A protein has these predicted regions:
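Surface-exposed beta-loop-beta
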Residues: 114-195
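Outer membrane beta-barrel
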Residues: 1-113, 120-127, 131-138, 143, ...
Length: 195
């Protein structure tokens, strides 16, 4: 939804999934491409994008084309990587783009599950991305990026275990007692980097 010129609100709801049969919110964020309420400075509108909210973190590029529940439009293979670096967290990021070069820096709470227990275990997570993305000809687009994600600690970080919708590898590598809802990440490998 475009709230005003250069200000957008994004909200994504899962209608159903392997993990939850009922509707539930994936996340939402406010995106600022212009600052009309601050006099709309040209430098911001030309080079910057700011996102703030509970959102899919901008780590790597695979999350732009991954299958997310029923949305498989950008993924010709339907299933995602076996190690799926995907998570939603509460935070923000700022992206600078100029002539194909991009620099992004972000900060999040480091986890999806908020709470007040064990405050000493909860630290801020920092995310960064450097890259080059340019349409070089009508048939050729070049994109090369590198990302970093770091945290000093969290109660339960979900960088490789953040897919709450479920994998498309139904029951692969599961035993005969498995169920599609209980084992909704079947066929995936989670390295267990939860802290």
């Amino acid at each position: 939804v475009e709230l005003m010129d250069g200000v957008r609100l994004n909200l994504i709801t899962y209608l159903s999934s392997r993990h939850h049969p009922e509707s539930w919110v994936k996340g939402g964020y406010l995106q600022l491409d212009k600052l009309p309420f601050l006099g709309n400075p040209d430098w911001f509108a030309k080079y910057m994008t700011l996102r703030v909210g509970h959102m899919e973190i901008n780590y790597g590029d695979a999350h732009f084309r991954r299958t997310d529940n029923g949305n498989a439009m950008y993924n010709p293979f339907v299933g995602n990587y076996i190690m799926d670096a995907f998570a939603t967290e509460v935070g923000g990021d700022l992206t600078f783009q100029n002539n194909g070069f991009l620099v992004m820096g972000g900060m999040t709470g480091g986890e999806i599950q908020g709470g007040v227990t064990n405050p000493d275990n909860r630290k801020v997570s920092l995310i960064g991305k450097l890259g080059y993305d340019k349409q070089l000809s009508e048939d050729f687009r070049l994109r090369l990026t590198g990302s970093i994600y770091t945290t000093a600690g969290s109660q339960r970080n979900t960088l490789y275990g953040g897919d709450r919708a479920g994998s498309r590898y139904y029951m692969v590598m599961e035993n005969t007692l498995a169920s599609t809802s209980r084992n909704f990440t079947s066929g995936r490998i989670n390295p267990g980097q939860t802290d």
